[in-house]
């Protein structure tokens, strides 16, 4: 879809120089001399490389039309992830690498967002918030809770997260997946 460069927003995907680029950030600049332009920080979807591009405000850009579908995680076999569409039960497979480092969060029946461009899957995403049990953590030492402090914990999937002092082993916590941080304790 053709648009003016002035309408570029972070989070959009552009077709540019024969590739797909995710707009990470933009800056509108109006120099004292010459026309206004947009400096866009973009990330190549295929390679992950960052790229900076300058567009004139009145230039025409092409925004990619993406299809997003939610699938349910079934199982992983080797480097292949098997997913099922929740309404028509169609099963698809994707490469585990599409999830990147977030593959550690995969759980049975988890909803996975799959993004396709021209019927080719280009990315997959786990939910922003995932509930996990604390497998191992240090016990609280009395008097150590006067200030807000964190302690390391190992979760059921093997990852390490810093959690507040009141978290005990077997507690369930919510992890914010974009930055792999503690979000809250699950109230039972």
Curated annotation (Swiss-Prot):
GO terms for biological process: peptide biosynthetic process. GO terms for cellular component: cytoplasm. Pathway: Protein biosynthesis; polypeptide chain elongation. Its main location: cytoplasm. Gene3D superfamilies: 2.30.30.30, Nucleic acid-binding proteins. It is found in: Cytoplasm. GO terms for molecular function: translation elongation factor activity. Keywords: Cytoplasm, Elongation factor, Protein biosynthesis. The keyword Cytoplasm applies. Pfam families: EFP, EFP_N, Elong-fact-P_C. The keyword Transcription regulation does not apply. InterPro entries: Elong-fact-P_C (IPR015365), NA-bd_OB-fold (IPR012340), Rib_uL2_dom2 (IPR014722), Transl_elong_fac_P/YeiP (IPR020599), Transl_elong_KOW-like (IPR013185), Transl_elong_P/YeiP_cen (IPR001059), Transl_elongation_fac_P (IPR011768), Translation_prot_SH3-like_sf (IPR008991). SUPFAM superfamilies: Nucleic acid-binding proteins, Translation proteins SH3-like domain. Belongs to the elongation factor P family. Involved in peptide bond synthesis. Stimulates efficient translation and peptide-bond synthesis on native or reconstituted 70S ribosomes in vitro. Probably functions indirectly by altering the affinity of the ribosome for aminoacyl-tRNA, thus increasing their reactivity as acceptors for peptidyl transferase. HAMAP family: EF_P. This is Elongation factor P. It comes from Wolbachia sp. subsp. Drosophila simulans (strain wRi). The gene is efp.
């Amino acid at each position: 879809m053709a648009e003016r460069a002035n309408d570029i927003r972070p989070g959009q995907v552009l077709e540019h120089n024969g590739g797909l680029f995710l707009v990470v950030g933009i800056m509108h600049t109006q120099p004292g001399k010459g026309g206004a332009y947009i400096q866009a920080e973009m990330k190549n979807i295929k390679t992950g490389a960052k790229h900076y591009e300058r567009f004139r405000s009145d230039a025409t850009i092409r925004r990619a039309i993406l299809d997003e579908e939610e699938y349910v995680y079934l199982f992983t076999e080797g480097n292949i992830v098997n997913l099922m569409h929740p309404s028509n039960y169609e099963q698809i497979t994707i490469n585990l690498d599409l999830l990147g480092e977030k593959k550690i969060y995969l759980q049975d029946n988890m909803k996975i967002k799959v993004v396709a461009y021209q019927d080719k899957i280009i990315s997959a995403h786990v939910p922003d918030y995932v509930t996990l049990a604390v497998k191992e953590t240090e016990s609280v030492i009395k008097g150590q809770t006067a200030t807000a402090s964190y302690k390391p914990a190992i979760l059921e999937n093997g990852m390490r997260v810093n959690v507040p002092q009141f978290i005990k082993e077997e507690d369930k916590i919510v992890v914010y997946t974009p930055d792999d941080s503690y979000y809250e304790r699950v109230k039972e």
